[in-house]
A protein has these predicted regions:
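Non-heme Fe(II)/2-oxoglutarate
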Residues: 1-72, 93
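Catalytic core of non-heme Fe(II) oxygenases with the double-stranded beta-helix
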Residues: 37-47, 57-146
Length: 146
């Protein structure tokens, strides 16, 4: 897996669409790509797509339609996968955002900041590389905990 992750990082760092852009408004102090699964993907990006498709299929099979559940009441009959890459500068971050057409979203980290290893061992409170779902107060006025 380490070799795959290294290859994926190199693929992203050399992707022709990786750039600083105001169009990608949720990336702060970092660069983002356009759609990676646009039909031209190859190498590690193609392998990533295959893994995601398999996992999404497994997830859907394990969570059948349930009319009494808000998430499972209307699952898609078929799905497609969209993907983009983000590379952050020091202290870069992803701003609060949402994926309106998405039924299911996920994140894959092929590389992590070194500080996360120390944080996992309880040696630092540095939040570099962390992810949090559900907190949207600065855009929507919601101050509740996720």
């Amino acid at each position: 897996m380490a070799s795959f992750n290294k290859d994926l990082v190199n693929y992203l760092l050399n992707h022709p669409s990786l750039t600083y852009s105001k169009v990608n408004r949720s990336v702060e102090q970092g660069r983002g790509t356009l759609e990676l699964f646009d039909g031209t993907e190859h190498g590690p990006a193609l392998e990533l797509k295959k893994m995601i498709m398999a996992m999404a299929g497994d997830f859907m099979a394990a969570h059948p339609k349930d009319p009494d559940h808000p998430f499972l009441a209307d699952p898609p009959k078929a799905f497609e996968v969209n993907c983009w890459g983000t590379v952050y500068d020091r202290e870069g971050r992803q701003l609060v955002h949402f994926h309106p057409p998405a039924w299911l979203s996920g994140v894959y980290y092929p590389a992590l900041p070194a500080s996360m290893k120390e944080a996992a061992k309880g040696r630092t409170n540095n939040i570099e590389g962390w992810i949090e779902f559900g907190r949207a107060f600065h855009l929507f006025g919601d101050r509740r905990e996720p």
